[in-house]
Every structure is written in structure tokens, then in C-alpha cells.
Amino acid sequence: MSARLISNSIPNLLNGVSQQPDTVKLPNQSTLQENGLSDIITGLGKRPPTEHIAKLNTDTLTNSKVHIINRDSNEQYVVLVNNQSVKVYDLAGNNKTVVTPDGLTYLTSTNPQEDFNLVTVADYTFIVNKTKTVAKSGTLSTARPDEAIFYVKNGQYRTTYEITIDGSSVASFQTLDNSNASNASSITTDNIATELTNDLNSNLSGYTIVRDGSIIYVKKNSGTFTAEVSDGLGGDGLILVKDKTNSFADLPYKGYTGFVVEIVGDGGTEFDNYFVQWDGTAWVETVKDGLDNSFDTSTMPHLLIRTADGNFRFCKADGSSYTVSGTSYTEPEFASRTVGDETTSPDPTFVTRKINDIFFYRNRLGFLSDENVIFSKAGKFFTFWATTVTTAVDDDMIDLAVSHNKVSILKYAVPFNEQLVLFSDQSQFTLDAEEVLSAKTVSINQTTEYEIDDGVKPIGLGQNIYFGISRGSFAGVREYYVNADTEIKDALDTTVNLPRYISGDLNGLKGSSSENTLFAFASGERSSLFVYKYYFDAGSKALQRSWSKYKFVDTDILLDGDCIQNYLYMVIKRADGTYLEKLNLKTNEVDTGLSFPVL
């Protein structure tokens, strides 16, 4: 039988590569597309060239972490982070000075590309090393001495006021009766306190005793003591305040500067207890003494600070001071616990654990650690403690865990569609909140169950999030979306028809929502850039899904890049060093002085 000649027209070649059999693939798909650009306006053409910007350095490292700082339209920088090294360049390729007073040991890594995550907020770029375990400072706050306050609250005629220390009566005073008007001075609270103080000074040694009006402060200089009072007035005449009291109303009108007492509240639980301290003018909420209330800043995320002179400073966030052009500045500092104790204001859950991701959401800095999401206090990116334990405050820090029937270690967080999408190895969750993000309004719900490649951070582009998946020695990309009609969340495999196309593991996902383009950097073919072009109509129907690749010189290693203002900036390692280049994504733009593009 002779072969039949079949003739048919192909309307376009816009849907890129497919590895399906010819009988199955779409007419506008091909088996190979290299250095071609599938554009829904101009059709299939040649990809734009890269433009050389600068040779950054002579380094030949192949796994640098690349981060682009897009501060504003006038200031953008490329950050290269390596083992105990951080370098910064502007987008013209000029090297910026990076002062490193401390903290470079935090950047110890054998695989910077996977171990480091960065996020930029204004002049601060936070760098987290995912291999570091967060620790406390190891320094306990100074413990208060054993102390007490005796408060003469009421004076009555012919009443005995007595103080007992360690089981022995050490001070006693009986007021006069009311038979004579001159006896009225006997019952003033100041007089009673004076008489009791005189007895205390006479009968006690090794104590510090201070009277202030009707208040008597007693401190044992070494060791502890017990104390009791009696007044013949049912406990309403002479009040003892030592260690703890049942109610804030039980406190005297004044105290001794630095004196701390615990308000125990409901005796059935410790969760409503709190501590107050006399600060010299008022009783203010404070923290229990003798606790480790601070982080070891050498284990916390570090800072790359853009300084006033346009250069940079890499350091711990420990509040150190520095000078630029004669002006003094102070580095930010991670706040310490200032209220409560380990029960009412517990350590954030990232303590003794590793931080897997760092992000910014609704004016809060956020960490992912184990199964928990931890947010800073709103607007206070260095505060991860409650500011009061007496009530729930909307802008306080938030620390909550995902709920699932299997272990779900959270790896990445991506803001999306007014929500925060959380990725674990096998599941996806959404963090939802009402108009105000607070511990009272926030919730986490599981949405989809897809395995991810946890070596590459997902990226949000337009109405979708793209995340990597592993197929053995190849990789793929899923497209997470919300169905506009049903609001059901799902993740479509964009590489289902080319399962053996992206070689190796994904090193990076970057893209431009204005140009409907996703770029994938892969470990198995580091001289190529995998390109996904997509287009959706007004009803969210996909009119284009096109995978292809841009090939570079075989010896080139594409480290990573990012998109800024319709340009893809790429850091490329070559045999003699590291280069910065850019690729124009505006397909319909012509070259200056010409009426047509030069390819």
C-alpha cells in the first residue's frame, strides 16, 4: 500500500515543544524549539539577544546565591552571596563597598544557592541561612534579691500592727485609743510605718530597710526569708506584697524602684499570670527575672543594610553603632522578651529550630520553621515577642502551626491573591485573615496535595503561582491557580507533555507578569534558559502554553537572575569570571534609530 500524502495548514507555531507522539501533539507544537520566541502578536520569531553590561569579578563559583534588590526606579542592585562572602553591584556592574564588621561566619555554606534565602524591605535585606539552628543568648537576666513591701494602708485606734520574719516577730506597734484628740497622730499611716521601721532596724541584721511614707521596703542582702503580717483589721490595715499577689488592686499606691511582683489572677491556671514592676512613678508590666529573654543574634537572620553613602553593611542585628560620613547610626536589634514568663510569653517556635524561609506579608516580617508560621509585630520587623500578656493585641506577633494528618514541614511562603500560600514537601496551605491580620483572626487551611521540589522557591506571576516538581533526573513546573467560577484551588502540570525536557533539578524560577513569561534555571543544562510563555483570555482560558529554551555558549553557566522593568538581568559564570547581562523582554520594541528590531 502506498503512503498517503496528507496536506494541512498550520495556523501558527505558538505552543512550543511537546514530547508527545506526532499523532497526539497539537499542530502548533514542535519537537524542538531553541532560541525562538513564541509571541501571540508577532508569531514565532528569534529570541532577543542578551546585552553585556559588565564583568563583575573573576570568581568562578558555580552555585552563588543571586538576589536582585529593586529599591526604586533609580536604585537596583545585584547581590551575590557565597560561602562567608557577600558582594553587591549596581545594575551598571559597579562594585559597591560592603562593610563586614561581623557575621560572615553566618554565611558558612557548601551550597549557597539552596542554603540562603533573602528578602528586601526598604534599606534592609534579610539573609537567612537555612542550615543554622536558632539559639537563645545563654544569658539570664539578673535575678531580683528576696524582697518585700509592707504597706500600712489604714490606721485605727488601739490596733496592733505586727511583722513576722522567718517565724519571729520583729516589729510591732499598737496605736493609742481615741480618748484624747492628740492621739490622732498615732494612727496616721506614716507614723505606724515609722514605728515599724524602727523595730525592723533594731531587730534585723543583714537586711536593707527603706521607708517611704507608709511604704516599707525590706530586702535580705543574702539568701531568702519568709514574711507575715497581722493587723487586727482583717488584713485591711497592713498589707504584705512579696513574690506574688492575687490582684493588681492589692498593690500599694507606690513601690520601691525595680521591685517586681507577680499578679497571679485565676488560681486555676498560670496562663493569666503577669508581672509588674515599680519604675519610680508607676506599676508597669514587666518580665519575670532570671530568664534568658534574648536571641543569640549570631544564629538569627543577618542584615545587608544600604547605608547613607550608597554602600552596604553586612552584620548581625544586634544594635551596634556605626558611622558614615561623620554621622552615627545604629543597627537594628532583635527585641528581647519584656513581659511575662516562659508560660505566658513563650519562646517563638523557631528557637532551637532552623528557619526555612523568610518573607514579608501585610507589614510583618515572617519566618517558616518546622510546621509553624511566625510573624513579627506589625510594623516592627525585629519584634517576635508579645508586648503584653494581659490581653490579646491585634498588632502583636503571631505564631501558629498548620494542621494536617501528616507531618508538613513548611518550606516556602508566597503572597498570592490577598492570601499567603504555604508550601510543604507534599501539601499546600493558605493562610487567611480578616481585614486585620492578628492572632485572633488568622487561620490556615490545607488546599491541595502536590509534591514540590523544595530546592527552588515558588514564584507568583499574575493570577498564578509556579512551583517546581521533580521527575527523577528531570524537572517540571506546576501552575497553582484559583478557579474563577468555583474558587477551587488546583495546580496544573505545565510540563505534562514534556516530562523529559527540563534536565536535572530546578535552580531558580523567575518571571515577568507584564510579559507573561516564566524562566526556569536547571542544574542539568546550565547553559540553557527554559522559557514558558503563557496567555489567558478574560475568562482565564489558556490561549497559549509554550515551553522552549534559550541556548547560550556550552561553557556558560547561568547562575540566576530576575526581571526588572521588562528586562531579565542574568548573572553568568564563564571561564574567566562572572558577568552581568540583560535580555529585553519587550518583543515588539525596535532598536533606537531603526524601524525594525535587530535580531
PLM region spans:
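Structural signature of eukaryotic scaffold interfaces centered on beta-propeller domains
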Residues: L56-N74, N111-V121, D347-Y361, V402-N417, ...
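Catalytic or ion-translocation cores adjacent to nucleophile or general acid/base/metal-coordination motifs
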Residues: V436-S473
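N-terminal beta-propeller domains
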Residues: M1-N95, F248-I409, I469-K489
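Elongated alpha-helical scaffolds
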Residues: Q113-V134, L420-F423, T430
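Conserved beta-propeller blade signature
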Residues: Y77-V79, F126, R364-F367, Q419-V421, ...
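Long, charge-dense tracts
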Residues: Y106, D115-N117, Y124, K130, ...
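Loop/turn residues immediately N-terminal
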Residues: N83-K87, T131-T133, I215, R364, ...
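Beta-sheet repeat architectures centered on beta-propellers
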Residues: S2-N74, A475-L599
